[in-house]
Amino acid sequence: MVIKIHDLRPAPGSKRDKIRVGRGEGSKGKTAGRGTKGTKARKNVSPRFEGGQMPIHMRLPKLRGFKNRFRTEFHGVNVGKLAAAFPQGGTVGIDELISAGLANKGELVKILGDGDLEGVKLEVTAHAFTGSAQEKITAAGGSVTKLDR
C-alpha cells in the first residue's frame, strides 16, 4: 500500500483543541481564568519590569563623555618590526609597508618606538612618528620624513 500525503493524520490524542478564552460566561469566560483585577489580570507586564527589584537599566552606570567624530586614527608600526621587515635598510615608505604586510591600503601610518633598529639604517616616510621612534631612527643613521594627512 502506498502512503499519500492526504492520508496522513496525527495520532489520536496527540492534538488538543485550542481553548478560546473570554467568550461568554462559561468557565473560561469573562475573566478568562486570570482571577480578578491586579497587574496579572491586565494585558501584560512590561518586559523590563523585574518584580520590584531595581531594574538593570537603572543599576548600570550612565554613559559618560562623547566620541569625537573628527578624530584621526593611525595604524601603529613599531621600529622593531621595521628592522625585522627591512634588515638590509634603505627607503621605507607607505607602499613598502603595505607590501611587507605591516600596514593596510588607505590607512594613516604612525611609527612607534617599541623595539630596536640594531644598526639598520632606514629612511622612513610616514604620516606621524613618536618622539622615541624619531630618536631611534636618527640615532641609527637614518632619516624621518612626515607625510601630509
UniProtKB/Swiss-Prot annotation:
GO terms for cellular component: cytosolic large ribosomal subunit. The keyword Ribosomal protein applies. PROSITE patterns: RIBOSOMAL_L15. Residues 1-28 have a biased composition (Basic and acidic residues). GO terms for biological process: translation. Binds to the 23S rRNA. This is Large ribosomal subunit protein uL15. It comes from Saccharopolyspora erythraea (strain ATCC 11635 / DSM 40517 / JCM 4748 / NBRC 13426 / NCIMB 8594 / NRRL 2338).
